[in-house]
Amino acid sequence: AVTDLIMKRSATSETGSWRKARTIARYTEHLFEDILIPLSGQSESWDALHQGIVIAQRENARLHGLHIVKTKEEAESNEAQEVKARFEQICRDANVQGTLAVDVGDITTRIIERAIVTDLILVKLVNPPGSGLSVLNSPFRTIIERSSRPLLTVPAEATPFTRALLAFDGSELAKEALFVTAYLAEMWKTEVTVFTARGDESRKEDIQDYARRYLELHEVEARYIISQQKEPRPLPDIAAEYNADLILMGSHSGNKIQQVLVGSMVDITLRSSTIPTFICR
C-alpha cells in the first residue's frame, strides 16, 4: 500500500513542483544535495558513478547507490556485496559521501520509490528507448513519466558540464530545464546555448525572448539559436556543433500516439546522444 501511494504521488506530481520546491535552495544552498545512482554492477554501469562524483564534488552532494536484484539470496551474495564495497570505496577515494543499498524487487519500481527522498536520478544509458510501439515499454520512459525527480542519463564517460545545450520550446517542462540551466551557468560557470525549433517563426522569437529575459535576470550570458529548418535537427548534432558536453530538455510532451508514430524528441535524443542528457519532468 505504501509503495502504491508513493508511485501514485510521484506520477501525479504537477509539472514545476520540483523547481518550486527548490527555488529557495537555488539561492541559499546547492540544488543537488542527494543523488540516486542505480547500478547493475556491470562494467559500463560505473560511468554513472563517475558522473555522480563530478556533480558531488561541485555540489557537496551525497551519493545514494542502488543495486537491485531479483531474490534475497542474490542480495546476500558475494557479488552484490562486492558492488557495494566497490561503490563506497570509489566514493571514499574521491572524498565524496556515498553509500550503496542492495534491494530486491522490480528495478523501475524500486528506483521510483527511492527517488522520492533525493534530488536527482542519475542512470547509465545502456538500452535507450526504441522506436514505434516498443518505446512505450522502455524502463527509461517509465521512470521519466512516473518519477517526480529529474533524470540525468549517461551514455558514455562522465563530462564536466563545461558547455550546455538547452532545448527550449517554451513549455512548462522546458522551463524546468531552463531553471537548472541558469543554476549551472551561475554556480558552475557552464557556457549556455539555447536552441528553439518548435512553433511558427513569430512564436520562436517569443519563446526565445522568454529564455533570454530569464537568463538575463540571473546575469547569465548565452548564445541563442533558432532553427530555420522545416525538419527538426537531432539535438546531439547541434550539441556537437557547439562542442557541448550536456543537453538539457523537458520530458515527453504531446500524446502517446503521436510519439509512437512520429517519435518523441526525448527518445530520439537518448538513442543518439553520446553526452549526458538532463531530462526535466
Task: Label every model-predicted segment.
Residues 1-20, 51, 110-158, 239-281:
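Gly/Ser-rich helix-loop-strand patches that form or flank binding pockets
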